[in-house]
Amino acid sequence: IALYRIVFEEFLILQLGLFMFKNGTTEVEGIKFNRDENLDNILKALPFKLTNAQNRALNEIIEDMQSNKVMNRLVQGDVGSGKTVVALLALANCVLNGYQGALMAPTEILAEQHYISLSETLKPFGMEIELLVGSLTKKQKEKVLERVKNKEIDILIGTHALIEDKVEFNNLGIVITDEQHRFGVRQRSKLSEKGINPDILVMTATPIPRTLALILYGDLDISIIDELPPGRQPIETLAVDKGKRDKAYNSLVRREVEKGRQVYIVCPLVEESEAIEAKAATELVEELKLEYFSDLRVGLLHGKMKASEKDEIMKSFKNKEIDILVSTTVIEVGVNVPNATLMIIENAERFGLAQLHQLRG
């Protein structure tokens, strides 16, 4: 009974803290947006129809935007469920109301991916979209910062570079964070502080049961996209015994590469460890090149590499210059390589459920 009482007290304090925080944010007067009629023209221009779940999430977001309270919403949906297009439409509605929008992603590759998809859809409607990432030259950065300050840019997409002190928005209306679990609370709030009470939208692909989500993110309203767009094939997940490892490499991997596809192989460690019995990426690359795939292009990616090296490897993989990419969990943040159709995860027991789900996505 004493233990239950302590657990209850902890949850009570957590919930009271979240309740007070949420009360504080909902009582703050935010921006009252209208649902601009041009948003329907953007919707019509999309090369696909939104799913019912996407429409529901979009309506919930627009409803929040139309209120004069600050929006604080979490959009949760599996990888491939179409969260990005919902974020795109929220940003578009913000710009159509005369405000600027910001989208923050955890990696340069993901930020570039968003920049390309938003530009393709929104530039024909006269919206100015720009990218701010660490790899830009000083001169390029200065030009982007100047244009944002002068409101020549409607939507700024970037990495942690967005929260630097030098970044000044003219009229920030909405802040969107992708893969929100990769950012701390302070980082997210630092971006929203660049405007006067902008609406806040955070996105995650990690599946959190609704009750747990309400405990963890009690300060947020939740929209769930629980439906995949038509034509998306379900992911087949298999557990392979260690004894069948050779067969998995020799038949599964080779078969996919011969079809012109690409393969990920994920390891829990970068280098071998005496304390942990698990596959290390650096050793596995050598093993694959010598024993299995001497005729194929095998690449290596891990967290100890410089950011520029990692981006270079991912670009090579995306451009089909690498057949098999051996990696650690640095690839878990939603990079879109449609040609990669198989992933082998070594020592899967060494990963958390959220990590496995993210990798699977």
In which residue ranges do the predicted regions lie?
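Pre-Walker A segment
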Residues: 1-81, 85-102
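Inter-lobe coupling/hinge segments of SF2-like helicase ATPases
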Residues: 28, 70-361
